[in-house]
């Protein structure tokens, strides 16, 4: 299956797209250069004759969309009548229209692009050719009204002076176009906005050879027919990469994805963005948003200022420059792009606010302008409820596997399909991969539960069963099979760190913490033998587990000059030293300065020691130089800061009831007299938000620190953002959290 997909990705060209009967019929009407009584493209007429559907219509065989069927059918009938061919086809088509044209109703949001312009013109041509089509029906009068309103809004001077989306529907404005002037907007490929029908119409009025060469090329490539748009090479490539990533199977195709993004970047403009094809001179916010997000995620240099091209002075956004409308899917992709913001990316903040407000007000019955996806509204709901920096990747993939439609259709002048974006191959691999990884994760949980029982941690009165929750957190982020040892180590270490923290909370005193610190520095369990049974159980488990981890790490770090046992001891000692400071503050009821608190608390939160010990299992060789780079990295500092502040906000009420007085909230309130608790939390949330922007930039910008290690730090920050939204979901999982764990770790993808 993977090899089959690689072969598919290796064949990407100008875009694989389903044929359009409507556009093919326009091309079929073109007279031959050598004999005007014959068609230039007789093969397209054969295609029309052989692709009429059983009910007499033309259009998508597997999806009945009334506007698509009626428009395509009228277009095909006009083409056949032009050459006085296919009388049986014409009779069947006329019968279909008589039975179905009345189904056209008032626009419910499902009109095709430019339908109100092109359909009424098409009907007039059908009437002139003597086709028997009913035209005196209420729906057509309504459509005629739509057409008149649209024409009143279109300044014809602008149509002839700057490129607009009207070029895509020129065949609907034939009586209003100056054909000589309009030729200034012909694309370098000879098309008008990549539309075969619009280009065919222009050719029949101008006989411009560039148009004909474009159409010849499309008919040849698509085999006797044409699609509604061509080429769509950038659009197809971007949506393929996005689909692979959302389904969680992109790791199998990294070389192919790099080739795709290199191709896209070649046509990227920081000033204008991109359109659906490399020849598209009219850029759009949909392709630009997708391109920006994917290119930034993969380390390419792109500027968010590109979105100025799609923003009004009132901070509103639109799909095409100089126009005033947009659909939901394009703003949805703008919203997704806005979440990969770096520091000072102010326009992305504006984009996020605008998109979030618009998407939050969508009705479930909304019909998108550009696509008819299986579960589009559910996709929007999920994204709004799960921001990128707090959504665990495997939870995201499980959701998208459910929402993905292998048979989804897309909307332009007609409906169309993208078989390289929506297909059974992608979804089948995604399900197979998800379930295979899930099976490995379940096996790891059993290993961890046996380890847990052997250490007798379950006997501790203060420590609940956190094994599954702890494992779920890392397994939902670093989920690949090759990170199995990392997940086991990370989970064990996280549980040990949490045990030490709980031990300090329930039984700790500065004196006891000093004993534990000395035992860690000496690596001697006998130094805690005089302490309580709970302390001895904890230290014994810590001692045995760290020794096992050192052995495992030494096996995978054979060339490292680092003394791994001493390194892990050092990290543990730093953690306990920081917890000792916490204990002393608590004993004295001392509230330090905000800066002093954070200096210690970003260590006592336990992420620095966890990460600096876990990195041995990231598949990279860790030298002393690299270790020092990681220790000093802004990436590590920001991860610890986010973890601490998220933890403080989530556990504040519980810790206060327990008697703890020093937290980032209380320290900030003490320094800023008169502010409320909620104001302090709002300030801390602001720090978290800005830290995320900086961390995102650190993570996505190439550096000496390997990507897998930066990813582990980034995912750890993401875990804390997820675990501690407003409460402690680690010690006391909510029902939603428990349900998510069940869904990701135990329910297979079906």
From Swiss-Prot:
Coiled coil: none annotated. It holds the Pfam family Terpene_synth. Binds 3 Mg(2+) ions per subunit. Mg(2+) 3 binds at residues 647, 651, 655. Mg(2+) 1 binds at residues 501, 505. Pathway: Secondary metabolite biosynthesis; terpenoid biosynthesis. It is an enzyme of class 3 (hydrolase). Its EC number is 3.1.7.10. A motif (DXDD motif) lies at residues 284-287. GO terms for biological process: diterpenoid biosynthetic process. Keywords: Hydrolase, Magnesium, Metal-binding. The Asp-Xaa-Asp-Asp (DXDD) and Asp-Asp-Xaa-Xaa-Asp/Glu (DDXXD/E) motifs are important for the catalytic activities, presumably through binding to Mg(2+). Bifunctional diterpene synthase that directly generates the endocyclic double bond, as well as the hydroxyl group: produces an endocyclic double bond isomer of copalyl diphosphate (CPP), and carries out subsequent replacement of the diphosphate by a hydroxyl group to form (13E)-labda-7,13-dien-15-ol. This is (13E)-labda-7,13-dien-15-ol synthase. It comes from Selaginella moellendorffii (Spikemoss).
